[in-house]
Structures are given as structure tokens and as C-alpha cells.
Curated annotation (Swiss-Prot):
The keyword Nucleus applies. The keyword Nucleus applies. It is found in: Nucleus. Present with 189 molecules/cell in log phase SD medium. It comes from Saccharomyces cerevisiae (strain ATCC 204508 / S288c) (Baker's yeast). Residues 26-121 form the BTB domain. This is BTB/POZ domain-containing protein YLR108C. Keywords: Nucleus. InterPro entries: BTB/POZ_dom, SKP1/BTB/POZ_sf.
Length: 485
């Protein structure tokens, strides 16, 4: 660099491209902002053709080229021309360097910046230099940062191909109004670290993952458990219903052996069948068994083979599982009730409000797309009035509780049907045997606080199979569940 006098030529627009290079041994003067640079032809040729080689090929070598750009950014460009790798510090420097690399038409530097090993962003006022290698796994690749970069580069390519005058359409430095603390946790998890996270923090991180489109990491944070069922010889996945991804839900078609066998298990929980009465335990007498020593109560048969005669829904967690597992979904809502019909010996689950909306949102598509029998959940919908006399939509679905680990009012209940059949059970419940004509009958209604279910289909019908449930029967029992602050 020097202060030698010479003709100063100011260029602020793009020059025509020429493949000619400059003499390697010549020194050329370039003033960027308030700083004068003396640069050899060999250095300018290192990323040619470019703005400088085009200019000095048409002007005297003693001409001083003046460009009104940032000298600080040009120092990084100058070091790149000298062969050094650019060390970019933050999102502002990255954006400015990319803008000037385009302005000076430096093809190698533009390519290097596009393929740089880091994303630069600012989360809630804190700058982050994020290694792209953290997003190598399927489901994390097409994330927020990759999408923004791709859109920006595509706009620049359109601008270059159309040879439009002026500056390229660059996005401003990346600023995201999210929590930097949560983002640090995300980077730690992507890097393979194990963090002790509370339920509340996990829920917050899941929301952050959705914002940044880190789909695989989101699924890794979702609470789920894979268990092996030795009775069915199948693996099962336990997961909250609101964490289920619709695209991972499938219905496994039954084999001809299972679909053709309309045994007690098939009809065990269907409305209006004798098999239902036996399987649910509503109707058992000594004459049923006779004197046959080999007689096995119907409830036992159901426990072993009910699922084999229903197409149970399966679930494969996106980006995590390679195969589907039998789905056991958990309902946290208390907007669910089990209705035991004493007269018709039926069991139904009544889902209302958010629980009904959630159930329909997760399963309506897969049930309608069933290749054997399309099932429309609207056929299970009824309009009922709540305690404030407001009309709301309910989903009322046939259910089976014969294999359920059931808790009623805080106590284990081994035989719920003995309570229903008791002469003291004279409560009035909704008769759900015909949803088009609703009446009330004697029975028992239990409100669910927490429950786990399987969903099965067969011949165009659906059934909810209770796996585990905690219930309460009335206001006093509900009050017992309320904890002090």
C-alpha cells in the first residue's frame, strides 16, 4: 500500500466479462473506501475473471481504481486472493462478505461462501456460528437455515442469469427472535450430548425444533417407549396421542385366517352380540360352564386373542423407526368418559372437545384410506349439550375394557362389570347402541383422567381397546385428585 499519485477512476457498475488475465508481476492500485491497496496481478488472477481483471485489462496499469465499498470487508477478500481461507466471525460479516464477493464477481469466493461449513445466525441477540455437520441426519437436513440459504441463493442466481443492473437481492443478516438458551440446548443435543431435561423444558425444545424444522430431533425429544409384548410376539410403541405424527400411522391388513374366523374374540366388543356380553363380563352364570372341566371363561379367551382378529393400528416414528409397531396411545385429557350400558351390555368411550378433535385429526385420514373398508368418523359423531346447555360435538366409539388395568377412584378394579351388574348401580347414562336415536338407560359412567388405548378396525368397524386407565366416578372423587398449590 502506498500514497503514490495517479489517475483515479471510479467504477460503480458491472463490467463485461473477459477471460484475459493480468501480468503476474505487475502491481495494481485499488482504493476501497479510504484505504489504498497495492495488489499484484498474480493475486488478482487467483480468482479470475473478476471485476479487477476486467477493469485493468481495459485501463492503464497506473490508474487507481476507486470503489466505494467497505475496506474491512475487502481485507478479508484480499486475504482470500492471497490464498488464505476466510475466517468469518458472525452473520453480519458473512452477509457483507457474500455481497462484496458478488459485487467484485469473484467466482471462487462466491462458491466457497455458498459451501461454507457453517451457518451464521443471531438468536435473540446472541450470534451463533453453527456447523452444518450437525444437520447431517435425515429429518434435520432441510431445516430453517438450509431453506433460507437456498431461497437466497436461488434469488441471486435468477438475478445473475437475467443480468439485472444494481446490487443482488441479498437477505439482511439472519436474526431470529427466539430463545438463545434453548438454541444452545438444541446444538448440544445435535452434537450428541445427553441433557437432563424437565417435562416443561422438553416441551419448549420440541416447539423450538418445530420452528427450526429439525424434524428428527423433535421426534427424539418426544416421550415414547418401545416395549415387547410376549403374548402377541410383537413390539409396541407407547406415545401420547398429541405427539403422534399422522404420516406414521398405518393399518396392517389381517390375514385370511384371521378375517375369516368370526370367533368370540371378533364379536367380543361389538354392539348387540352375545359374544360381547360374555367377553366383557356382563353376563356370566354357572350354567355357562356346565360340568365341563375344560371350560375356560370367555374373558380369558378375549385376553389372549382379541387383538388377533382386529387390524390394530401401527405406528412408525418418522426418522426414528425403521419398522412399524403396534400403537398404544395415551390420552391425558379428562374430556373422555367410559359409558357402561347395563341394559344392552355395551361399553363405549365418549370423547369431547379437544380430545375428540385430536382423535379425529390423528386417525380420520388413515381410516378413510383403509383399502378394505373406508371408515368415516363422522358416523360416530353426535351433538350433545354440556352442563352449560351449549351444544358440542362428541365422538362415541365402541370399546373393550376386558384386558385393561383399571383404577377407579384411586383403587384397582379387577372386575368392573360386577359394579355395573350390582343392583345398586342405577345411574342414568347415554344409550349409545344407536347414535341416531339417543336415549338414557341404567349404567355406569367413569371419567378418565389418564388412559392408554389401542385402536382396531374390522369389516368397516372400529373399536378402542383399553390397556390402562385411571378413572373417577363423581365430583367428590374428582376433588380428591386436586392437589394443593
Amino acid at each position: 500500500m502506498s500514497g503514490q499519485k495517479g489517475e483515479i477512476v471510479v467504477y460503480t457498475k458491472e463490467l463485461e466479462t473477459t477471460p484475459e488475465l493480468l501480468p503476474n508481476h505487475e502491481v495494481f492500485k485499488i482504493r476501497i473506501g479510504q484505504k489504498l491497496f497495492e495488489i499484484s496481478g498474480a493475486t488478482l488472477n487467483s480468482d479470475a475473471p473478476n471485476f479487477f481483471t476486467q477493469f485493468f485489462n481495459t485501463h492503464d496499469k497506473n490508474t487507481i481504481l476507486f470503489v466505494d465499498r467497505s475496506e474491512d470487508v475487502f481485507i478479508i477478500i484480499y486475504r482470500h486472493l492471497q490464498g488464505y481461507f476466510p475466517d468469518i466471525k458472525n452473520e453480519v460479516q458473512f452477509t457483507c462478505l457474500f455481497a462484496d464477493a458478488l459485487y467484485f464477481q469473484l467466482p471462487k469466493l462466491v462458491k466457497l461462501i455458498k459451501e461454507y461449513d457453517y451457518h451464521f445466525t443471531n438468536i435473540g441477540g446472541v450470534p451463533f456460528k453453527v456447523p452444518k455437520s450437525l444437520f447431517h441426519e435425515e429429518g434435520n437436513r432441510l431445516n430453517y437455515f438450509e431453506t433460507i440459504s437456498r431461497i437466497s441463493y436461488e434469488e441471486i442466481e435468477k438475478w445473475e442469469s437475467n443480468k439485472k443492473p444494481g446490487f443482488p437481492p441479498l437477505l439482511p443478516p439472519s436474526y431470529i427472535a427466539r430463545s438463545p438458551e434453548f438454541f444452545r440446548d438444541i446444538l448440544s443435543l445435535l452434537g450428541g450430548s445427553k441433557l437432563e431435561l424437565s417435562e416443561e423444558r422438553t416441551a419448549s425444545l420440541i416447539k423450538e425444533c418445530r420452528y427450526y424444522r429439525l424434524n428428527r430431533l423433535e421426534q427424539e425429544l418426544v416421550r415414547a417407549k418401545i416395549i415387547y409384548n410376549p403374548l402377541t410376539n410383537c413390539q409396541e410403541v407407547c406415545i401420547a396421542l398429541d405427539s403422534v405424527s399422522k404420516k406414521g400411522v398405518t393399518i396392517e391388513r389381517l390375514t385370511s385366517l384371521h378375517t375369516g374366523n368370526q370367533s368370540l374374540a371378533v364379536s367380543s366388543c361389538l354392539n348387540g352380540t352375545e359374544g360381547e356380553k360374555a367377553a366383557t363380563g356382563f353376563h356370566k352364570t354357572e350354567t355357562d360352564s356346565g360340568n365341563n372341566d375344560e371350560y375356560e371363561p370367555p374373558t380369558k379367551k378375549v385376553k389372549h386373542c382379541i387383538e388377533r382378529h382386529w387390524s390394530m393400528l401401527k405406528y412408525q416414528r418418522p426418522y426414528i423407526d425403521t419398522v412399524s409397531h403396534d400403537l398404544i396411545f395415551q390420552l391425558h385429557s379428562n374430556q373422555c368418559k367410559i359409558i357402561f350400558n347395563k341394559k344392552n351390555k355395551t361399553v363405549h368411550v365418549d370423547l369431547s372437545r379437544e380430545a375428540a378433535v385430536l382423535f379425529e385429526n390423528k386417525f380420520s385420514d388413515v381410516l378413510l384410506e383403509n383399502p378394505d373398508f373406508k371408515i368415516d368418523l363422522s358416523e360416530y359423531k353426535v351433538k350433545l349439550r354440556d352442563s352449560q346447555m351449549q351444544v358440542e360435538s362428541h365422538l362415541i366409539i365402541p370399546a373393550c375394557v376386558s384386558i385393561c388395568d383399571l383404577t377407579v377412584n384411586g383403587a384397582k378394579c379387577c372386575n368392573i362389570f360386577s359394579l355395573v351388574n350390582d343392583s345398586k348401580c342405577k345411574g342414568r347414562v347415554l344409550d349409545c347402541t344407536n347414535l341416531k336415536v339417543l336415549n338414557c338407560v341404567h349404567g355406569l359412567k367413569l371419567h378418565l383422567s389418564k388412559s392408554m388405548w389401542k385402536l382396531g378396525t374390522n369389516n368397516g368397524r372400529i373399536i378402542l381397546v383399553a390397556v390402562k386407565a385411571e378413572t373417577f366416578s363423581g365430583t367428590k372423587e374428582y376433588c380428591k385428585m386436586i392437589d394443593f398449590l
